[in-house]
Amino acid sequence: MRYAIVFSSKTGNTKLLADTLHDNLPQDACSYFGAPDPAALDADTLYVGFWTDKGTADAAILEFLEQLHGKKVFLFGTAGFGGSEGYFNKILKTVQKSLDRSNTLIGSFMCQGKMPLSVRQRYQAMKKQPIHMPN
C-alpha cells in the first residue's frame, strides 16, 4: 500500500498532525508528504489534512479533494475555535461533500489547534472594552 500525506497548515497546527501521522506510519510506503500536489495522486491511500476556514476546509484542500477518484481517504483537520465533538463533526461532514462518491472515506479526525497569539491578543483587547447594550 502506497500512501500520501497531503496537508495545508496556516499556523502550524495541521502540520503537527501530519508529522505525527508520518512518524507513525511505515516510512517506506510514503510516496508523498506535503502541500496539495498532483504527485500525491499516485498513492492508493491519502491522508488529507486541513485547517478550518468558515466551517469547512481551506480552499487549497477543497480543490485537491475534488481531484480524487477511486482513492481511500482519511481526513484530518484543526479548528482554532470550538472543542465540541458536534462542531468538529459538522466541519468533517461539510468537507466530505467535496469528495467524489468513487472514493472511500476510511476515517477522520479533528481537534482544536492552538490559537495564534495575534488572535488571542485581539480577544483580550475586546474583553477589556465596555459592553454596549443595544438601544
Q: Would you name each region that the model predicts?
A:
Residues 2-24:
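N-terminal beta1-alpha1 ligand-phosphate binding loop
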Residues 3, 23-29, 43-48, 53-135:
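FMN-binding flavodoxin-like domain, especially the glycine-rich phosphate-binding loop
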Residues 31-42:
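Short acidic low-complexity segments
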